[in-house]
Amino acid sequence: MSDYKFTLNLPETEFPMRGNLANREPEMLERWTKDGLYQQIRDSRIGRTPFILHDGPPYANGSIHIGHSVNKILKDIIVKSKTMSGFDAPYVPGWDCHGLPIELKVEQKVGKPGQKISAAEFREECRKYAAEQVDGQRADFIRLGVLGDWQKPYLTMDFATEANIVRSLSKVIENGHLHKGVKPVHWCTDCGSALAEAEVEYEDKTSPAIDVAFTATDSKALAAQFGVSDYSHPVAMVIWTTTPWTLPANRALSISPELDYSLVEFVKDGATHAVILADVLVEACMTRYGAESHNVLGKVKGAALELVRFKHPFLAFDVPAILGDHVTTDAGTGVVHTAPGHGQDDFVVGQKYGLEVANPVGDNGVYKPDTEFFAGQHVFKANDNVVALLKEKGALLHHVAYRHSYPHCWRHKTPIIFRATPQWFISMDNQNLRKQALSEIEQTQWIPDWGQSRIEKMVENRPDWCISRQRTWGVPITLFVHRETEELHPDSVSLMARVANRIEQEGIQAWWDLDAAELLGEEAEQYRKVTDTLDVWYDSGSTFASVVGARPEFHGHGVDLYLEGSDQHRGWFMSSLMISTAMTGKAPYKQVLTHGFTVDGKGRKMSKSIGNVIAPQQVTNKLGADILRLWVAATDYSGEMTVSDEILNRSADAYRRIRNTARFLLANLNGFDPAKDLVAVEDMVALDRWAVRRAAALQQEIIEAYEQYNFHIVTQKLMQFCSVELGSFYLDIIKDRQYTAKQEGHARRSCQSALFHIAEAMVRWIAPILSFTADEVWQLLPGQRDAYVFTQEWYQDLQSITLDTDLSDAYWDNLLTVRNEVNKVIEQARRDKRIGGSLEAEVTLFADAALTEQLTHIGDELRFVLLTSEAKVLPLADATSDAVETELASLKLVVNATTAEKCERCWHHREEVGTIEAHPTLCHRCVTNIEGDGEVRLFA
């Protein structure tokens, strides 16, 4: 054989079987950076239709986690696939840089502002800390193979962006959406600040649940309303609450106008009590109170009790019964304790009745000095003292520890309170913002589509947006208010424009350094500067204007797509929608795509305490970024995304299948120069034409899946193509032709041309997902080409050919089915030790007329399709008794061991081996391929 080995076309490539991604990817990244790859892509798309995916900024604090990786990889897949589709798709990553978490980190290092360090110095420290965090996260994102303008990202703390945030607010004010009010807001006593809705988490908490009696100021008159005359006992209305600490701020009792309320007399411990309760809750309440007996004396509708007065249980004033739509009978008594300073519903109903918005609680959660009974006590510690006082006053009917879901601060994990404070709000209804936003939601495409109803419900029910915070590190609310009237300066909009220009030069510190007289002149004495900062959700929510609307690479084009985790319906999607609609009357996006959260193999959240955290840095260091990218692409992101070591190892297995296919293609393109060796599609061997046609059809399906953001379908189709159509069929069949045909002959060049077309297409299909591997393949493909696959478009030379009417896709599908049946019988013969490999087999196919016509169409080349040394087709009626039935009624098979000699070069067993004098160990075909013009193949 040694003489003939050198006549074979053995596969050869520098593309290694093992990816060694963890080591090789960083080398590729260095080259991408050195070559200015991102700018090359931008230059290649000048003048093309823009596609703008706007990056929702992660917070500049801490290392990236697997959720960040999912998000950035999904964005990168979209940007790269849109670029392949010919769009100019810039990607400018961003970071959210202001706000409390950074302040807390800096406080740990340098202390609180105004103590050891000035506020100005504190802001500078915050800026430095945020910049360090950005650097760390940026390196991790780049390592994932995400291409973008990493050297010029947008930061909400960039002077220009800070200035644009102020300009955005001035537009909101100009359009009449801002108002100042005293309102109850989520308040964290640890932060000492208001919280946005998105900063609130619900956790279980144990609270005192109490039933409290408010005695009527005129019990006899009230009993008469229930049809009971001359009643001698005190009559009380009973509330149920889990926040006893709010009772000092009680200003009313809310009841439902539609509900029936009963006057109930009950006896407990020998004492008679008369109480008013919702009729449907009477039995439950009597059981709860341990009543020995009870009697309903009368019923009235809630509406009849409006404005009846009741004494506060421990303060020297009385409060009215008022009507509210928020009253339910899910629990409690059907009467709601109403403290307008401590609850949103309470506030709304209180406004209707002109109730005082009392707030006896300070920033730190401690009662103010003038609070009777409880001054200086922390509200949660005061709960027990309130209960004790109620007991002492005879107003406590029941008290129990109650476990319930309660709002907590997402940073401190501590319970929060509702607390009325003077704040700045964007009104949802003054200028019809709610109505406009709901209309814009309908004009937006939500992926998955349930996102639409989710955000609609949130917009329908959300209160006015409190945009002010009492913090140091944030974009200032650059307003002047009158010292006496608290009214905004009449020239606020133009003043803000001037302040924004200063901030653009000097950053937000310019506002705190500003002497009001510089802008207001003599008026300065009448006005004071607002010292509040903006909610950081305003910072990020205005980036469609402050970044996309301002940077030149976006060409003033609106945003096509926002893509974030499903928690952002109430976060970034919401804040962006509110600001954009308030500024322009339009949504800031055309499409909004959400992905689920990552969970472990058992469906649990990632948690350090459970020990199930999978860090992206560990995955890239061990398996490589392409494995992580393949897992992201292959997972249906519309639900929870399950990840574990086992799942990532399965991704690595799938990756190896794709890599091995790419390696086979490259190895068999050895010595192929498309400029001179490419065979026109119409001149190819029929099977090669089929392979190119299949690739063309698959490309259409893959492009469509990319366009619909169905990346798991891309990976499914790719795996199917590599494993079945290529791996188990086409590549298997062509090995013989590739290795043994004449090197320059048509049979081999036809096959190489098909492999070249498939490789050119496939490297583009995988580029958005397996970016490192695609680059590696691209560098080794034959022929003249640009430096990077990422500047290319989908492969245009995949012609969908229809020349083969008789050898259609259906024809080859049938042949594949027949081949699978033959393989089963050959496999059985191998197990029975009747043959070794399939080339030791002679197969006889007994087929009906229709199948016979198909099988004989390709003549002697049928044996190459079946990978046997001989294949004969005979009528089904002639089937011998030893013929094996198959799953096809039209086919029976007999497999026998060949008696012919084995060709030393191609390993086929042929009768002529040993009869050719010059080459006694070869078959005719091999002799032709060595010495003659090369074999002729038409079909396979």
Curated annotation (Swiss-Prot):
Record's GO cellular component terms: cytosol
Ranges spanned by the short sequence motif 'KMSKS' region, renumbered to the chain: 605-609
Disulfide bonds: none
Quaternary structure (record): Monomer.
Family, as annotated: Belongs to the class-I aminoacyl-tRNA synthetase family. IleS type 1 subfamily.
Entry text on domains: IleRS has two distinct active sites: one for aminoacylation and one for editing. The misactivated valine is translocated from the active site to the editing site, which sterically excludes the correctly activated isoleucine. The single editing site contains two valyl binding pockets, one specific for each substrate (Val-AMP or Val-tRNA(Ile)).
EC number(s) given by UniProt: 6.1.1.5
Binding residue positions for L-isoleucyl-5'-AMP: 564
Entry cofactors: Zn(2+)
NCBIfam families with a match to the protein in the record: ileS
SUPFAM superfamilies: Anticodon-binding domain of a subclass of class I aminoacyl-tRNA synthetases, Nucleotidylyl transferase, ValRS/IleRS/LeuRS editing domain
Keyword tags: Aminoacyl-tRNA synthetase, ATP-binding, Cytoplasm, Ligase, Metal-binding, Nucleotide-binding, Protein biosynthesis, Zinc
Catalytic activity: tRNA(Ile) + L-isoleucine + ATP = L-isoleucyl-tRNA(Ile) + AMP + diphosphate
Protein's UniProt name: Isoleucine--tRNA ligase
GO MF annotation, one: tRNA binding
Lineage of source species: Bacteria, Pseudomonadati, Pseudomonadota, Gammaproteobacteria, Alteromonadales
Native source organism of the sequence: Shewanella sp. (strain MR-7)
Main location: cytoplasm
Function text: Catalyzes the attachment of isoleucine to tRNA(Ile). As IleRS can inadvertently accommodate and process structurally similar amino acids such as valine, to avoid such errors it has two additional distinct tRNA(Ile)-dependent editing activities. One activity is designated as 'pretransfer' editing and involves the hydrolysis of activated Val-AMP. The other activity is designated 'posttransfer' editing and involves deacylation of mischarged Val-tRNA(Ile).
Highest taxon listed in the record's lineage: Bacteria
